[in-house]
Curated annotation (Swiss-Prot):
Name used for this protein in its record: Putative 8-amino-7-oxononanoate synthase
Cofactors that this protein relies on: pyridoxal 5'-phosphate
Keywords: Biotin biosynthesis, Pyridoxal phosphate, Transferase
Documented EC number(s): 2.3.1.47
Species for this entry: Desulforudis audaxviator (strain MP104C)
Residue positions where N6-(pyridoxal phosphate)lysine is found in the record: K236
Encoding gene per record: bioF
Residues at which substrate binds: R19, H131
Entry keyword Hydrolase: no
Quaternary data: Homodimer.
Reaction(s) catalysed by this chain's protein: 6-carboxyhexanoyl-[ACP] + L-alanine + H(+) = (8S)-8-amino-7-oxononanoate + holo-[ACP] + CO2
Function text: Catalyzes the decarboxylative condensation of pimeloyl-[acyl-carrier protein] and L-alanine to produce 8-amino-7-oxononanoate (AON), [acyl-carrier protein], and carbon dioxide.
């Protein structure tokens, strides 16, 4: 085994793709200690900065004192608790769906919804740039997998005309995690209706960020949420841990009876459920936080434009594609030397030849942090 492991790791390293863990000690939503030095983070998914919001931390502490550190069992055994039930009701209201079902992670939620709904006689039409969890759900299902061009409704239509099966599914992200762009959801919904397909939208990065009161990309697109399937996470804008699926009323019942990644795993800890529930309440009670996020996004994108740097899209995720892993690593290391932490994103997380800096803006960033980072970024890209 040792020889195989060493040989594989050497190949990964030779391609500039070897990864390692870097311990960070959080100091707040956007700052951390790295090797004893304070750095500013422009890479987290903590879009609203709610991990340190007083209401969120207080509710988590209260749940910790009341319920302890873990759930102790699967939900169908003794792991279901009042906080999980309240969280599911709040998520259903947020998404405008009849019901929601919470999972330990967003990954397990996607495995469940696709891997359980689809089967060997079905066809799944999946965007080429969808997250690994969506692709793994497709492969797990055993259904025929057809990849359509990224965010391309014409490509999807052509393929829908070419491939038939018992049932058909259209799978996309609401806000793409690596490119920061949004698909034409109204067109996809129309195609789903026309071809009697089931539309599944992973709104992990749109939840809490887009749409009225942060209800997500489906609400932003004006699509009736009760007629499609939405998955998402609690670990990004909602400042906790976990995943969820919303959809027609019977979907939750179906998944809790059939989805292996729900049945055979320990329930989300009460402390995580409490934090996510509090974050949803903050979204409703403090709209200024979401407004602040978009003010920061605009400030950063305007700063990029002023420096002649690409700023496509309109979201808190800004990819600067540098091509080779080596160049992306050099740029990331230069930024770190200047006190900014933005790891290089390399294949297989992104397609070959598109290694990048994946920059994310948070509501918790200050104007001074944004302006300082813009100056540092210009220097890093020149020297990369």
């Amino acid at each position: 085994m040792r020889e195989f492991l060493e040989e594989t790791l050497q190949k990964i390293e030779a391609a500039g793709l070897r990864r390692s863990l870097r311990p960070l000690e959080p100091l707040g939503p956007t700052r951390a200690l790295f090797n004893g030095r304070e750095v500013t983070l422009f890479c987290t998914n903590n879009y609203l900065g709610l991990t340190h919001h007083p209401r969120v931390t207080a509710r988590a502490q209260e749940a910790l004192r009341k319920y302890g550190t873990g759930s102790g069992a699967a939900r169908l055994v003794s792991g279901h608790n009042p906080l999980l039930q309240a969280l599911e009701e709040a998520l259903a209201r947020c998404k405008g769906s009849p019901r929601a079902l919470v999972f330990p992670t967003g990954y397990t939620a996607n495995l469940a919804v696709i891997g359980t709904l689809a089967g060997r006689e079905d066809v799944i039409f999946c965007d080429r740039l969808c997250h690994a969890s969506l692709l793994d759900g497709c492969l797990l299902s055993g259904a025929k997998l057809v990849r359509f061009s990224h965010n391309d409704a014409d490509s999807l239509r052509r393929l829908l005309n070419q491939h038939t099966g018992r049932r058909r599914f259209i799978v996309t992200e609401g806000l793409f995690s690596m490119d920061g762009d949004i698909p034409p959801l109204p067109e996809f919904y129309t195609l789903a209706q026309e071809f009697e397909a089931i539309l599944i939208v992973d709104d992990a990065h749109g939840t809490g960020v887009l749409g009225p009161n942060g209800r997500g990309t489906v609400a932003d697109a004006g699509i009736p949420a009760e007629r499609i399937v939405i998955s998402g996470t609690l670990s990004k804008a909602l400042a906790s841990l976990g995943g969820f699926v919303t959809g027609p009323g019977l979907l939750s019942e179906f998944l809790l009876n059939r989805a292996r990644s729900f049945i055979f795993t320990t329930a989300l800890p009460p402390v995580s459920a409490a934090a996510a529930l509090a974050a949803l309440e903050v979204l409703e009670a403090e709209p200024a936080i979401l407004e602040g996020l978009w003010e920061n996004v605009m400030r950063f994108r305007q700063g990029l434009n002023a420096r002649g740097l690409p700023a496509s899209g309109n979201s808190p995720i800004i990819p600067l594609i540098l091509g080779s892993p080596e160049r992306a690593l050099r740029a990331a290391e230069n930024l770190l030397e200047q006190g900014y932490y933005v790891p290089a994103i390399r294949p297989p997380a992104v397609p070959p030849g598109t290694a990048r800096l994946r920059i994310t803006v948070s509501a918790a960033h200050t104007p001074a942090e944004i302006d300082g980072f813009l100056n540092a970024l210009g220097k890093a890209l020149e020297e990369a």
